[in-house]
Amino acid sequence: MSNLENLTSKIIEDANKEAEKLLSEAKKEENEIVDEKVKKANKAKEQIIEKTKREAKTKAERVISNTHLKVRNNKLEAKQEMINKVFDEAVIKLQNLPQEEYLNFIKNSILSLDIEGDEEIIVSSNDKDKIDISFMLTLNNKLKDKGKKELLKISNENRDIKGGFILYKNGIEINNSFEALVDSLRDELEQEIIEALFS
């Protein structure tokens, strides 16, 4: 073989070796890049899964918390409804007092107040006919016995109240309607009613 052939053969052989080496390095680099991308993709996937789990947990906790809040609010509303019903029933019982008891209530309530004795008694239109002249004379005599004026009179005005009365004089009112009396006791009695109903 001639030197030229040897040289050509050597160049081709070296070129083939260099090509194989370059291909091998390229393949290795490709594998490293692919491995790195796979690692990054797996890490990103894990982060996405972890983030999704956290978000799902947070959302679930929020839903549970909102549900607990709604249940608690519903219970409170139901309790408040029952308490309101108790107070409404108290007003109804007062409305259904026999006439004699009702008039005694009005008389005793008025006599217990620090009044001058020349006020007007405002009642509902339903109660206007229950209070007659005889009742007013008796009431005014009792006021006189206490050293008060005996000028108490029934007002021509009616009020939309469920019972009881309102005393009026010079723009000042003392509200002794059944609703006002029950409401005035509400704060005092509400805790007792809650304990009686829900214990």
Curated annotation (Swiss-Prot):
Keywords tagged on the record: ATP synthesis, Hydrogen ion transport, Ion transport, Transport
Gene Ontology process terms (BP): proton motive force-driven plasma membrane ATP synthesis
The keyword ATP-binding appears for this protein: no
MF annotations from Gene Ontology: ATP binding; proton-transporting ATP synthase activity, rotational mechanism; proton-transporting ATPase activity, rotational mechanism
Entry's Gene Ontology cellular component terms: proton-transporting two-sector ATPase complex, catalytic domain
Domain of life of the native organism: Bacteria
InterPro entries: ATP_synth_B-like_membr_sf, ATPase_E_C, ATPase_V1_Esu
Protein family (similarity comment): Belongs to the V-ATPase E subunit family.
Function recorded in the entry: Produces ATP from ADP in the presence of a proton gradient across the membrane.
Protein name: V-type proton ATPase subunit E
